C-alpha cells in the first residue's frame, strides 16, 4: 500500500508492507549477537511438508510491519554507533548548502528540503577509516560480520549439498567457498577482490558486499531529468526498486533540485547509493562542459561525501590521447560522463582534471570511505564498436588507477560495457580481471544486440547472465525504456526483476551453494500443484498470480491439478503423477497387479520369443510382421 507519513505536508509517499506470504526475520551472527541481519522468509502452505524458505532481502524496514515509516524523519541511523566505536573520526559543521547545489532555483520552484540535519563525520589523519584499511590490518569490522551472515542467508553452518553444488558449477577461476565467514570477507576486501560500499555518513545503511566470490548483485538507476520527475517520484522509485531486489541504487539526477533529491533518497535508503558527481558539477556551470574546473568538481565531491553517497562513478580513464580512437566508431562516445570529459579535454587541449588530480580525489574519498566506481567513459554504444582500442585503452588506464586508489586505502570497483555481442563478452571479463587485479567488475548489461528498442531489458539480460557467470560482481539493470525515455515505476520493476533473473542464473552456473534452494522449492511446489507456493516462491508473486487468474480466477482453481495451458487431460505433471501412482500399486504386494520389475521382465520375454519366432533376423519382411501382430 502507499502511505503518507504526514498528509498535511508534501512528503514522498512510499510503498510499504511485506511481499505476498512473506515476513521479515533476523539472523544474529555468533561473532556479534547484537547485530540483526535482515532476511525475508517465504511462508509455505500447510501441505507443503517442508520448512519455510529464507531468502536474501534488500527491502529494508519498508517490508517490516513492526516499523513505523516516517519518510520525513528518515530511517534509523543505527550504523553511526559502529563508526564511532572504531574511532578515528570527527564530527564537524560541514559545508553549507549553496543555491547552485539545486540549480539556483527560486523559492517557489525549489523542492521542499529534508528537515532533519545531521552533522557529517570525516576521518582523522593517521587513523584507519576505510573497510580496506581495516581488512589489511587484520581487523574484522561489524560490517564484515553483517555481510557474511547476509550471504549465508542466516545459516550458522554450510549446507549438506554445498560441496556438490560447487563441484557441479563452472566458476571460471572464482573461489566461492562452501560457507562465508567474516574472515573470508575480510580477506577478500584486503585483496581488493570485494568492496563494502559504506560511507561513514550513510548511517541508515544495511551493509552489503560486492565481489565475484559472493552472490551476484544488481543495481537500479533512478534520477530526475530536466524535463520530468520529482523528488517524490524518485524516493518512491528507490523504495520500489529495493522492494523487488535492487542491491544498490544510483541517483543519476541531471535536472533541478539535485542536492535536495539526493538528501531525501539517502536519508531513506537502506542500500548503498551511488552517483556520478560530474552531472551535478555540470549543472553548476549551466551545462557547459568547457566551464568545468577542478575546484568546482572538488566542491561537489565534498558536498556528496558529507551527504553520505557510498560510491562515485568517476571517469578518470578518459584521457586526451584516447579521444581520437573513437573517431571511426559507429556511435562515438555514448557515456554522458565520458562525453563531458572528452569535450573538456578537447576544448582546453589538456589532460582530464579527473586524471591529473586523481591522488587528491583518493585522499578526499578515503576520509569518508566512499568507494570508487571507475567509470567506462569510452564504453561501446553499439555492438559494432565492442572491444575496440578506445574501450580497452581506457580499461588499461583504469587498472593503473585501481592500484593508486588501493595504495591510498580506497575501495574500488570497475565499470564495464555496454553493447557487446555474446562471443565477445568473456574477453571483456578476462581482460578486466587481468588489468585491474581482480577488482570487482560492474557492467551495464551488456546488450547483446541492437535491434530491439523497447526490449533492451531482454537484450541486456542475456549478456548480464553471461558476464555474471564469467565473474562480474554487480550488474546494472536496463529497463524497457533504455534509449527511449526516463523509466517510470513500472519500468523500474521490470528492469529489477529481469536482472534478478540474470544474477540468479549466473549464481547457479557458478555453483553457488545456496542458489538452487529456491529453484528446487518452487519445482516441488509446481509438481505438487501448490499454486500459491509456486507464486510466492517466484521473484514476482503478483504477476505470476495475475497471469494464472486471468483464465482460472476462482479460489478452487488454486488447488486444481492443471492450468489453462494444457487443461485437465494433457497436464504432463498430472500424467506423471498418475504413472507414479500406478507404479506404486504394482509394487504393492497386496495389489492385484504384479511388480513393476516383473511386468517389465515378462514383457521382455514375450518380445524375445516373438523375435525367435520371426526367424531371429534383424531385418524382417513387413507383411510377416503385420501378420504376426494380428496373431498376437
Curated annotation (Swiss-Prot):
Its EC number is 4.1.99.17. One of its GO terms (cellular component) is cytosol. Zn(2+) binds at residues 419, 483. Substrate binds at residues 221, 250, 279, 315, 335-337, 376-379, 415, 442. It is an enzyme of class 4 (lyase). Residues 1-23 have a biased composition (Polar residues). It holds the Pfam family ThiC_Rad_SAM. InterPro entries: ThiC, ThiC-associated_dom, ThiC/Bza_core_dom, ThiC/BzaA/B. Its cofactor is [4Fe-4S] cluster. Pathway: Cofactor biosynthesis; thiamine diphosphate biosynthesis. GO terms for molecular function: 4 iron, 4 sulfur cluster binding; carbon-carbon lyase activity; zinc ion binding. One of its GO terms (biological process) is thiamine diphosphate biosynthetic process. Disulfide bonds: none annotated. Binds 1 [4Fe-4S] cluster per subunit. The cluster is coordinated with 3 cysteines and an exchangeable S-adenosyl-L-methionine. Residues 1-26 are annotated as: Disordered. It catalyses: 5-amino-1-(5-phospho-beta-D-ribosyl)imidazole + S-adenosyl-L-methionine = 4-amino-2-methyl-5-(phosphooxymethyl)pyrimidine + CO + 5'-deoxyadenosine + formate + L-methionine + 3 H(+). [4Fe-4S] cluster binds at residues 563, 566, 571. Homodimer. Belongs to the ThiC family. HAMAP family: ThiC. Catalyzes the synthesis of the hydroxymethylpyrimidine phosphate (HMP-P) moiety of thiamine from aminoimidazole ribotide (AIR) in a radical S-adenosyl-L-methionine (SAM)-dependent reaction. This is Phosphomethylpyrimidine synthase.
Amino acid at each position: 500500500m502507499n502511505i503518507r507519513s504526514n498528509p498535511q505536508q508534501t512528503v514522498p509517499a512510499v510503498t510499504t508492507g511485506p511481499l505476498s506470504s512473506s515476513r521479515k526475520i533476523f539472523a544474529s551472527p555468533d561473532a556479534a549477537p547484537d547485530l540483526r541481519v535482515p532476511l525475508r522468509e517465504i511462508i509455505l502452505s500447510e501441505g507443503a511438508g517442508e520448512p519455510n524458505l529464507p531468502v536474501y532481502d534488500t527491502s529494508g524496514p519498508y517490508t517490516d510491519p513492526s516499523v513505523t515509516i516516517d519518510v520525513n524523519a528518515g530511517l534509523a541511523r543505527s550504523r553511526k554507533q559502529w563508526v564511532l566505536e572504531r574511532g578515528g573520526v570527527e564530527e564537524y559543521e560541514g559545508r553549507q548548502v549553496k543555491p547552485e547545489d539545486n540549480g539556483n532555483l527560486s523559492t517557489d520552484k525549489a523542492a521542499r528540503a529534508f528537515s532533519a540535519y545531521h552533522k557529517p563525520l570525516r576521518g582523522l589523519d593517521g587513523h584507519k577509516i576505510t573497510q580496506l584499511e581495516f581488512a589489511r590490518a587484520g581487523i574484522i569490522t561489524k560490517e564484515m560480520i553483517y555481510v557474511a551472515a547476509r550471504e549465508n542467508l542466516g545459516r550458522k553452518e554450510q549446507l549438506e549439498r554445498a560441496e556438490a553444488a560447487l563441484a557441479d558449477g563452472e566458476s571460471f577461476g572464482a573461489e566461492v567457498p562452501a560457507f562465508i565467514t567474516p574472515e573470508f570477507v575480510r580477506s577478500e576486501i584486503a585483496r581488493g577482490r570485494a568492496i563494502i560500499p559504506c560511507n561513514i555518513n550513510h548511517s541508515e545503511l544495511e551493509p552489503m558486499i560486492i565481489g565475484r566470490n559472493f552472490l551476484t548483485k544488481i543495481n537500479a538507476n533512478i534520477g530526475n531529468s530536466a524535463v520530468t520527475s520529482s523528488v517524490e517520484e524518485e524516493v518512491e522509485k528507490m523504495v520500489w526498486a529495493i522492494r523487488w531486489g535492487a542491491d544498490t541504487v544510483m541517483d543519476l539526477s541531471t535536472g533541478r533540485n539535485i542536492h535536495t533529491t539526493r538528501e531525501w533518497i539517502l536519508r531513506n535508503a537502506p542500500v548503498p547509493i551511488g552517483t556520478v558527481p560530474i552531472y551535478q558539477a555540470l549543472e553548476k556551470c549551466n551545462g557547459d562542459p568547457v566551464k568545468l574546473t577542478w575546484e568546482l568538481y572538488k566542491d561537489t565531491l565534498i558536498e556528496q561525501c558529507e551527504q553520505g553517497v557510498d560510491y562515485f562513478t568517476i571517469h578518470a580513464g578518459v584521457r586526451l590521447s584516447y579521444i581520437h580512437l573513437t573517431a571511426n566508431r559507429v556511435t562515438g562516445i555514448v557515456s554522458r560522463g565520458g562525453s563531458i570529459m572528452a569535450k573538456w579535454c578537447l576544448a582546453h587541449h589538456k589532460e582530464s582534471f579527473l586524471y591529473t588530480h586523481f591522488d587528491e580525489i583518493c585522499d578526499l574519498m578515503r576520509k569518508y570511505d566512499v568507494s570508487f566506481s571507475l567509470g567506462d567513459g569510452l564504453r561501446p554504444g553499439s555492438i559494432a564498436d565492442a572491444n575496440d582500442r578506445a574501450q580497452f585503452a581506457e580499461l588499461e588506464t583504469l587498472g593503473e588507477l585501481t592500484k593508486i586508489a588501493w595504495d591510498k586505502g580506497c575501495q574500488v570497483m570497475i565499470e564495464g560495457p555496454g553493447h557487446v555481442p555474446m562471443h565477445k563478452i568473456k574477453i571483456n571479463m578476462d581482460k578486466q580481471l587481468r588489468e585491474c587485479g581482480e577488482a570487482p567488475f560492474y557492467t551495464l548489461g551488456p546488450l547483446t544486440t541492437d535491434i530491439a528498442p523497447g526490449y533492451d531489458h531482454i537484450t541486456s539480460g542475456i549478456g548480464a547472465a553471461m558476464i555474471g557467470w564469467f565473474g562480474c560482481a554487480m550488474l546494472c539493470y536496463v529497463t524497457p525504456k533504455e534509449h527511449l525515455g526516463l523509466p517510470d515505476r513500472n519500468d523500474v520493476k521490470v528492469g529489477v526483476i529481469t536482472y534478478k533473473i540474470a544474477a540468479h542464473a549466473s549464481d547457479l552456473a557458478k555453483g553457488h551453494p545456496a542458489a538452487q534452494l529456491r529453484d528446487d522449492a518452487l519445482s516441488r511446489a509446481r509438481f505438487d500443484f501448490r499454486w500459491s507456493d509456486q507464486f510466492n516462491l517466484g521473484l514476482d508473486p503478483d504477476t505470476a498470480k495475475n497471469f494464472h487468474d486471468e483464465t482460472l480466477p476462482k479460489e478452487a482453481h488454486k488447488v486444481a491439478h492443471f492450468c489453462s495451458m494444457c487443461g485437465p487431460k494433457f497436464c504432463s505433471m498430472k500424467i506423471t503423477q498418475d504413472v507414479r501412482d500406478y507404479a506404486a500399486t504394482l509394487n504393492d504386494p497386496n495389489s492385484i497387479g504384479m511388480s513393476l520389475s516383473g511386468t517389465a521382465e515378462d514383457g521382455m520375454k514375450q518380445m524375445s520369443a516373438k523375435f525367435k519366432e520371426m526367424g531371429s533376423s534383424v531385418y524382417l519382411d513387413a507383411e510377416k510382421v503385420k501378420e504376426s501382430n494380428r496373431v498376437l
